[in-house]
Every structure is written in C-alpha cells, then in structure tokens.
C-alpha cells in the first residue's frame, strides 16, 4: 500500500462528496425526496463495485479514514444540532425501547444464525452485534472480542450495509401509513431503535423531517452508548463458553459521550451562533463523506463468496427490526 493513499483517498472522497452535493440539489433528487446521504451510499456502492477496485491501492487509507474517523467526528459534531432539552425530551421511551430491541435482536440473531441456519459462529456474533447496536462500528469493536477472521468481518459488514441501506428507503415509505400509531417523535425513536448504522438512521430520519432525524439520532446514540457494557458482557460469555481467562481489550465508544458533550456546549450557547452554523455545515459534509466511503467498501463479491445464508439471516433480522420494532415501539409509547 502506497504511503500517500491517505491523502489521495481523502481527495477522492472530497470529489465524490462535492458530486453528491450537486446531485442532491437536482430536481429529480428534490422531487424524489432523496437526501444527500442516501445518494452518497448509492453512489458509493455503485463505484465501489465497478471502477473503485482499480484505484483502491492508491486511495485505500483515505477511504478507511473517512469511513471510520470522519464518521465518528461527524456524529460528535452532530451534537451542535441539539440541546440537552432535546435529549431529555426523548425520555424513558427511547431508553426502554432501545434496551428491549438490543437484547431481543441480539438473541434472535444468534438463534437464527447458529441454531436454525447453522452458520459460522463468528459471522453470526458479528452480525448480531451490528444489527442490535450500531452496525459496522459494533462489528469492528466486536472483532477483538470474538477473535473473528478478517473475511468474516467483511461479510458481516456487507450484510449490515446492504440491509441498513434497504432500511433507509423503507422507513420513509412506511411513515405515511404508520403515522396513525406513531407521531414524529415516536417514529424517530422507532428508526433509532431499529436501523443498523448511525449514518443510516440520520438518512432515514432526514428523508422524513428534521424533527424525526433529530429524535432518531438521539435514540440511536443511546444504543451506541450501550456498546461498552454490551462488549463486556459478550466477552464474559465467550470466555465462559471457551473456558478461557484471557484478558480482552474492550473498545469504548467515546464518540457517543463526546456527542453529548457537544450538545451540552450548544445548550449553554458557549459558541457564537454563526460559528455553530459553520460547524453544522461542516458536519453535513463529514457525514456525506463517511456514507460515501461506507458504500465504496461494500463489496457484493464478499456476500457471493459467503453464500446465501448471511443474506437470509440479514433479511430475517430486518423483518424483526421492522415488524417487531414497530410493535415494541407502539407498546412502549402506550406505557409511558
């Protein structure tokens, strides 16, 4: 891998981000209600499975940096769009819903993958973590815990991105039909508690309204903050199963806590409004860049090599997230 792949990769991502912004302002995109993030993932997947592999050796480090570091920075700065009042308004509803969905999704995925589909346990554990918490970030965090092979990580990430991308389109389409049972606030919690990736949550909510997007992201960040204790629990369970006492490094999602810190700073107006407006603009570009990079690294070939079972698992879990998640959210909204 060449030393300048970080710089060239970031330049490449910057060009694609500029292109996405142009496409998002076209009449077609505006009439179809396609957000910049939705266009970014589609464009990324298209390029990632056509010409990008031919230039990946020159841009790989930059694309990986955008997919990881820029995504986390984008989520941290997203806190400047919110205040403590916004976070408190989500309330116990989001905490209860997120907890139920996390536990049920993880256990259901394990049962379907290991007991029903007879899949490789590493792939199933990684997929379960990605579906139940925060997508690729959770998968990457679980890799040292599960000792998973790199190609297993690629398969799990591909499944998450594919079905998370489907969710991005599905939830906005469902909203008009489910508005009778869930208002904007509740639908935001529904998205945040059941869509795979943080960026996908933002895209799905943003395709409905800014209010839904804000609530969805806050709800999602509650799930993200559950990652650290979740990893500790999974590590303990796997160690117990394997009868080992090896110490495993746990990846703590500090960006989730920094997200809250930015919201605190914004709540007390510690930064001038015109600077906050600039930060929000920069944040939008960071999220577009991260989503584009995520699409570029989604390789359809990895899914083909793994066979049909990962796709079946991803589809079954998506059905639970959409249908089961709806009933869980309706039930919780009736209780609180």
Curated annotation (Swiss-Prot):
Listed transmembrane segments: 5-23, 30-52, 62-84, 91-113, 123-140, 153-175, 221-238, 250-271, 275-297, 310-332
UniProt GO cellular component terms: plasma membrane
Keyword Amino-acid biosynthesis recorded: no
The keyword Ribonucleoprotein is annotated on this UniProt entry: no
Protein name: UPF0324 membrane protein PM1461
InterPro entries listed in its UniProt record: UPF0324_pro (IPR018383), UPF0324_YeiH-like (IPR004630)
Family: Belongs to the UPF0324 family.
Topological type in the membrane: Multi-pass membrane protein
Record-linked Pfam families: Cons_hypoth698
NCBIfam families linked: YeiH family putative sulfate export transporter (TIGR00698)
Keywords associated with the record: Cell membrane, Membrane, Transmembrane, Transmembrane helix
Domain of life: Bacteria
Compartment(s) where it occurs, according to its Swiss-Prot or TrEMBL record: Cell membrane
């Amino acid at each position: 891998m060449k030393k300048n792949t970080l710089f060239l990769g970031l330049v490449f991502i910057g060009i694609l981000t500029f292109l996405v912004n142009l496409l998002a302002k076209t009449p077609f995109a505006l009439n179809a209600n396609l957000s910049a993030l939705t266009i970014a993932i589609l464009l990324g997947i298209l390029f990632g499975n056509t010409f990008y592999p031919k230039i990946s050796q020159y841009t790989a480090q930059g694309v990986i940096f955008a997919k990881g570091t820029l995504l986390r920075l984008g989520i941290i700065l997203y806190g400047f769009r919110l205040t403590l009042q916004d976070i408190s308004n989500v309330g116990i509803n989001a905490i209860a819903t997120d907890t139920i969905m996390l536990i049920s999704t993880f256990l259901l995925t394990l049962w379907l993958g290991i007991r029903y589909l007879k899949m490789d346990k590493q792939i199933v554990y990684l997929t379960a973590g990605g579906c139940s918490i925060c997508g690729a970030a959770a998968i990457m965090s679980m890799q040292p815990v599960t000792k998973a092979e790199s190609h297993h990580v690629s398969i799990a990430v591909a499944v998450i991105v594919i079905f998370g991308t489907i969710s991005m389109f599905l939830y906005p389409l469902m909203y008009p039909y489910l508005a009778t049972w869930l208002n904007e606030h509740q639908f935001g919690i529904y998205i945040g508690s059941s869509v795979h990736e943080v960026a996908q949550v933002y895209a799905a909510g943003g395709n409905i309204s800014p209010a839904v997007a804000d609530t969805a992201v806050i709800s999602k960040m509650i799930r993200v903050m559950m990652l650290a204790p979740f990893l500790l629990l999974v590590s303990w369970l796997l160690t117990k199963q394997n009868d080992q006492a090896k110490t495993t490094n746990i990846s703590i999602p500090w960006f989730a806590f920094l997200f809250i810190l930015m919201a605190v700073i914004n709540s007390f107006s510690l930064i001038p409004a015109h600077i906050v407006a600039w930060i929000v603009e920069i944040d939008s570009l960071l999220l577009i860049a991260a989503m584009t990079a995520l699409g570029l690294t989604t390789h359809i070939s990895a899914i083909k090599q793994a066979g049909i079972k990962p796709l079946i698992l991803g589809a079954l879990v998506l059905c639970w997230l959409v249908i089961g998640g709806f009933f869980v959210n309706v039930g919780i909204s009736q209780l609180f």
